[in-house]
Amino acid sequence: MEWFEALILGLIQGLTEYLPVSSSGHLAIGSALFGIEGEENLAFTIVVHVATVFSTLVILWKEIDWIFRGLFKFEMNSETRYVINILISMLPIGIVGVFFKDEVEAIFGSGLLIVGCMLLLTAALLSFSYYAKPRQKENISMKDAFIIGLAQACAVLPGLSRSGSTIATGLLLGDNKAKLAQFSFLMVIPPILGEALLDGMKMIKGEAIAGDIPTLSLIVGFIAAFVSGCLACKWMINIVKKGKLIYFAIYCAIVGVVTIVVSQLQ
């Protein structure tokens, strides 16, 4: 992987991790364009995912600081309930990761057709959430946190946007727009770090191929993903507040159709 390829893929990861257009789907498309096999860029994938976690920590630092300050009071307050909701939202993705990891990895290697189909599904979800006008709730309940977690678990499919699925689901449930965007970005931190840790351990044990990627490419990819992630995270929060997700639905529909057509021509 050349440094300019790492730059482009890093920018794609940072932007699409937060924008509701599927980071996994766009990385798959980008890797296919550059002729990079999935097994060859595991180390790069870990690096850019960790970079987006740092982006979240930077942009949502005030919220994270608020959570930890309240959590260490060791009492049942709003901060503690927030953490409980995040833990509840992690249950579905945890079950998928533990019991269905091999099946999910097999789907990731199934080509661009599944990516295109899932992008169309993302477009449908975003459209439904845009036109539905449920009464907004003040806070995200435990029940809603679990349902949003189910949406996140389904979004392990390449092309089905994680942020798009979780935010669209929350909007359909009537959750507060501003709080929903923050919750969606915070709830993904533990799963991303957990997956990166497991993949890193596999590489150390020799159970997975790290890929012969130059250090410069890894550094460039990290910086690109971090900077673009910071911009996209802040931008996405404002987009959700203003209810402008329909534009991303149109984008996903177009890219989905093009991807399906290209997959059939290969």
Curated annotation (Swiss-Prot):
Q: What is its EC number?
A: 3.6.1.27
User: Quick one: which gene encodes this?
Assistant: uppP
Additional remarks: Bacitracin is thought to be involved in the inhibition of peptidoglycan synthesis by sequestering undecaprenyl diphosphate, thereby reducing the pool of lipid carrier available.
Any Pfam family matching the protein: BacA
Q: What name does this protein carry? A: Undecaprenyl-diphosphatase
Q: Name one GO biological process term.
A: response to antibiotic
Q: Which reaction does it catalyse?
A: di-trans,octa-cis-undecaprenyl diphosphate + H2O = di-trans,octa-cis-undecaprenyl phosphate + phosphate + H(+)
Name the cystine pairs: none
State the protein's purpose.
Catalyzes the dephosphorylation of undecaprenyl diphosphate (UPP). Confers resistance to bacitracin.
- Sorted UniProt keywords: Antibiotic resistance, Cell inner membrane, Cell membrane, Cell shape, Cell wall biogenesis/degradation, Hydrolase, Membrane, Peptidoglycan synthesis, Transmembrane, Transmembrane helix
Annotated membrane topology is:
Multi-pass membrane protein
One cellular component (GO) term of this entry:
plasma membrane
For the keyword Secreted, the answer is no
The enzyme class is: hydrolase
Q: Which residues cross the membrane?
A: 41-61, 82-102, 106-126, 140-160, 180-200, 213-233, 245-265
Q: Which InterPro entries match?
A: UppP (IPR003824)
User: Do you know which PANTHER family this protein is assigned to?
Assistant: UNDECAPRENYL-DIPHOSPHATASE (PTHR30622:SF2)
Q: Where in the cell is it found?
A: Cell inner membrane
Q: What's one GO MF term for it?
A: undecaprenyl-diphosphatase activity
